[in-house]
Amino acid sequence: MFWVGVKHHNRRLFDGLIPLPHGTSYNAYLVVGKEKTALIDTVNPGFDQELMDKISAHIDPSKIDYVIMNHAEPDHANAGKEVLKIAKGARLVTSSKGKEAAMMYFDIDPSRIIVVDENSKLDLGGKTLKFIDAPWLHWPETIFTYLEEDKILFPCDFFGSHLAVGEFYADEYGNEKTLDMAKMYFAEIMMPFRKPGQNAIEKV
């Protein structure tokens, strides 16, 4: 599994309202199995090429089999349009509400969309992805993706924070500082959705 996201160091506002003193990041992940490859989420407008360059360090982007859209907001999904153009055999994997969003935002043949629910799994060959419905965290189409063999959860925005720093892991940056940023993010974005959040945590 490889992080292929982007750190946006000089972004100073989120949604035109929320100050970003430490910038933000757009987290995308490449999961390479023995048989197939999945890209989990993509990046914000303006960063398509950086995403492609990072993917290319590991595989030919045209060989991607699945683009998993946990969330349809542009900072997660926008570059999916470009990936699907390059990886002509790839399919978009999302929830039923995500399919509705993709049909509005992407120029995509509906036959290329796989709708998943909590009974769905994708076998990549030694790497298995399963899905958790997490509606209203913080849009209605949100899902989490779980990589079973490595026990890694890709929780979309839910455990997020706005950080674009040199360190990659919380203990490198500082656990207390990381927790402070996560609390701020929860208060600013997720607090109105705390009940759906509790429901999602119970499923994990």
Put a short name on every predicted segment:
Residues 11, 72-77, 99-101, 138-139, ...:
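Active-site environment of divalent metal-dependent phosphoester hydrolases
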Residues 86-88, 108-109, 148:
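Short, structured coil segments at secondary-structure junctions
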Residues 40-42, 64-72, 92-95, 133-134, ...:
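Active-site neighborhood of phospho(di)ester-bond hydrolases with catalytic His/Asp-centered motifs
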Residues 46-93:
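Active-site metal-binding motif and surrounding structural segment of the metallo-beta-lactamase
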Residues 37, 91-204:
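Metallo-beta-lactamase
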Residues 1-57, 144-147, 151-155:
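Conserved beta-strand hairpin/beta-sheet module of binuclear metal-dependent hydrolase folds
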Residues 15-19, 43-45, 69-71, 129-135, ...:
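Short, flexible loop segments at the rims of nucleotide/cofactor-binding pockets, characterized by
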